[in-house]
Amino acid sequence: VGTVGVPTSGVEWRIAKGGDDDMGGEFQIKGEMVFAGYYKNPEATAQSIVNGWLHTGDVVRLQDGQIKIVDRLKDIMITAGGKNLTPSEIENTMKASPYIKECVIVAEGRKFVGALVMIDYETVGKWAEARRIAFTHFRSLVETPEVRQLIDAEIASGNAKLAQVAQIRNFHMLTKELDHDDGEVTATMKVRRS
């Protein structure tokens, strides 16, 4: 579970270490199946293919002989203490909660992990209605103390599944839903990091 399988036979591959053995390294492949390069873009080709090795940009690690994709190399964050963190692992752990729809990690150059959290309005709304908690819209629901306590507990539960350095120590709940029209998410509803 959570792996992409084993490399195809006849393919040379390697995991290029980046300094943090727990995290893994960049998956690189070499062979006839590697494309010749980007059309009319020699600079991009030179960055992606070095000495015949295709640098995929995927950070992977071996798990029981299987390749597990950890994150994209460009998304890895380095804390002030020099620890490499994979945001997607932390974010997906938190989004396993039915009450958390989005979680965006903030850790680059910081002493600890912070997060922006967006509740799942439908699920949290039903939870609040069952407890007779009054609210009229997204923001009013987020701002109730009971919802803050609920999300505190969900973050604590998620943190228990993570290494100490990856645990969220501070978070802010968004008072509006992320919106494609505002440029906060892509057309496929993936959070824009920049």
Question: Over which residues does each language-model region extend?
Answer:
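Conserved ATP-binding/catalytic segment of the ANL
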Residues: V11-A16, D21-T79, A96, A107
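Active-site loops of AMP-binding adenylate-forming
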Residues: V1-S9, N41-A44, Y121
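Gly/Ser/Thr-rich phosphate-binding loop
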Residues: V1, E12, K101
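Conserved loop-to-beta-strand segment in the C-terminal subdomain of adenylate-forming
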Residues: M23, E108-I133, K161-T175
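Adenylate-forming
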Residues: V34-F35, I49, Q66-K95, V124-P145, ...
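C-terminal boundary motif of the adenylate-forming
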Residues: K17, V59, S97-T123
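Flexible loop/turn segments at secondary-structure boundaries
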Residues: V1, D22, F35-G37, Q63, ...
